[in-house]
Amino acid sequence: MTQSEKIINLTNHYGAHNYVPLPIVISEAEGVWVKDPEGNTYMDMLSAYSAVNQGHRHPRIIQALKDQADKVTLVSRAFHSDNLGQWHEKICKLAGKDKALPMNTGAEAVETALKAARRWAYDVKGIEPNKAEIIAFNGNFHGRTMAPVSLSSEAEYQRGYGPLLEGFRKVEFGDVNQLKAAINKNTAAILVEPIQGEAGINVPPEGYLKTIRELCDEHQILFIADEIQAGLGRSGKLFATDWDHVKPDVYILGKALGGGVFPISVVLADNEVLDVFTPGSHGSTFGGNPLASAVSIAAIDVIIDEDLPGRSLELGEYFKSELKKIEHPSIKEVRGRGLFIGIELHESARPYCEALKEQGLLCKETHDTVIRFAPPLVITKEELDMALEKIKSVFA
């Protein structure tokens, strides 16, 4: 029995079976490359669902981690830490917002944004108590905690978790008429992924986000953009909402904000929104801790200094155009923006992902029939060409 098989057996025996990973164990990683305990090398084309946009173990981010770990790692928000202020300033200026509220995971940040939206609805907009509604979209994925689960349109995500939370409406992604019909006097916010990741890399119709912006302005509604997966360069723009030249009222960021090294997420908005929080109304023991702040500062610097959005745009256009040249009866559509690309099939994508793994390329199916490609944004054209050869061989 190999070391990998032993590890997988231990995980299957002692771990809850809430994931069905590909049968591979990763023990080392650098850049776009990962290695298993037996020494086999693979190209990572998933980037931990876009958490590793800067590449595995980017030296600047790792150095920031080490330097901070030698000083202080956690003080809780009962006290100030010496780099949280710097982090606040950097992330607010990056997004063009007045204030930031740091959390740890994407789901936590979504919960935070929903709490802010509801309190804003009552304190600022004047909606009748306990009547606020939030509109989301079919196919959405905002996390695994109870509010995101209640928002979901996937029956399996909700099965056995009732009673679900109330106050949510769902409409078809990209359908303007349904969205307009769902708005009423109690609508507090519209929560949208600018590109739906888990649903299969669904890109909205051109101008759809602009329409959301206009409707929010017209009806005094908060436009909340969940950029956890599509943001920070993944789509070929710093923020995926930039494709429609709009700025949401609230950004939710995570994943790549920690450079694939340490979890950190954030809700960003102007004073009118985040000033609804008062001392004791929200918090997190680890949110904004010194280690996360140091890592995140370095992670942001890498995104900007190395122009990862620009790299994603240029290489993504090349990659997508080459994928579209592949002719195979199983391929229904190739879509995406930047290095955030899906190949939708007429059949299950899992066997193709398993075949690509045998070719030394790691990716994962999503929504059953879509192969998702989201490599680290530091990938080179030469490495992309290597990936293309492996993909073509699987579809030969």
From Swiss-Prot:
Any GO CC annotation of this UniProt entry: cytoplasm
Keywords annotated in UniProt: Amino-acid biosynthesis, Aminotransferase, Cytoplasm, Proline biosynthesis, Pyridoxal phosphate, Transferase
Cofactor entry: pyridoxal 5'-phosphate
Domain of life: Bacteria
PROSITE patterns in the cross-refs: AA_TRANSFER_CLASS_3 (PS00600)
Subcellular location(s) of the protein: Cytoplasm
Reactions it catalyzes: a 2-oxocarboxylate + L-ornithine = L-glutamate 5-semialdehyde + an L-alpha-amino acid
List of residues that carry N6-(pyridoxal phosphate)lysine: K255
EC primary class: transferase
GO function terms (MF aspect): identical protein binding; ornithine aminotransferase activity; pyridoxal phosphate binding
Keyword Oxidoreductase: no
Major localization listed first in the record, in broad terms: cytoplasm
GO BP terms, alphabetized: L-proline biosynthetic process
Recorded metabolic or biological pathway in which this protein acts: Amino-acid biosynthesis; L-proline biosynthesis; L-glutamate 5-semialdehyde from L-ornithine: step 1/1
EC number: 2.6.1.13
Family: Belongs to the class-III pyridoxal-phosphate-dependent aminotransferase family. OAT subfamily.
Role, per record: Catalyzes the interconversion of ornithine to glutamate semialdehyde.
NCBIfam families (UniProt xref): Orn_aminotrans, PRK01278.1, PRK04073.1
Name of this chain's protein: Ornithine aminotransferase
Organism: Staphylococcus epidermidis (strain ATCC 12228 / FDA PCI 1200)
